[in-house]
């Protein structure tokens, strides 16, 4: 903003001044060249989309308030596109009726709108943004996987040409996009808003929200009986550990959420030294959740929630970090009291365990099994997904195979945020005076200054040099 690159017009919405627009145009051209090189065909799809299109896929209801919904003057439900899977299927549904036309890929560089609750970080987390989104269509999963690998390599070339060879790909969660496999392209930087787990032993990389959390527990030699002890003012794991002289890994803590669909409570129990992954929880439940506002009517005793004697009418889940443990400390569901000696199977009956925890720093790598995980901050600059038949099946896209049978094609999708990419280049390529743009995307190649503009000879020489540079195709700021 201070450098004259952009100006805010509303929360999370910016106008671009000429220097930034020149940068983003060059980034867009690099992206176009690499998408064309892998057989992409550029199209343009509307920003405003009918709600009925999103109803076909089921996302009109399943996606939360980040999707901006409104009605036109006739009362027809409409949305502002935050992603274009539905529009892409609608665009090629008739074209893709015969197997001979596969595989193919379409892409666009288009404005999108996502109604972020907390826009932040300049162009990193905005509400209106420009994105390259591409969609590929295939007759087999094997063909999709081959093209997915080609697109992965194309992304590596894009980021290298843009001046960000440091970008790495990490395994990620598919989230609302659906599908079986996805990767995020991350710039590792302390300014990042995402957490990335990297194994120092085998090189495994993943977003901590998606990485499998492996916990190894040694069962105690002797099980203690379940006992209730008074723990005044021990509302947190830290306070509880200090009061009872235990470590967080010896605690069974409760994290409470509410389902966005009906507001019902979800109580997740996990080991006290771990954090819950809201992404994993959402995927398991099949609906969005939010941290709960615990009210007296809920029957929950905040700070003292435990699995023994917990009130009914809510979903209760257990993380795999508790499997095989014993002699745990947990809430007693009474204000100011905890229980010691908890062994879940003995005290709660049959328990099902699932992975709901974030992979922690120093944790065990899910690939090589070594405790060599290091967690770093990162900014996501791109993503790729193998969507399978999630959208084509729901929206009735079919093709006729060589044997005359109708089949459903599978899809991949591939996104890059153009403004976010520019912001990331600026984040790592700057000095005390401002951005140091790589030549390939710099707004101008030469900054020509006439230091004695009041001298006719100097001014004439500067003008002549400016004209000569322009004639030879050099971009000059004068």
What are the functions of these language-model segments?
Residues 1-478:
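NTP/phosphate- and nucleic-acid-binding module
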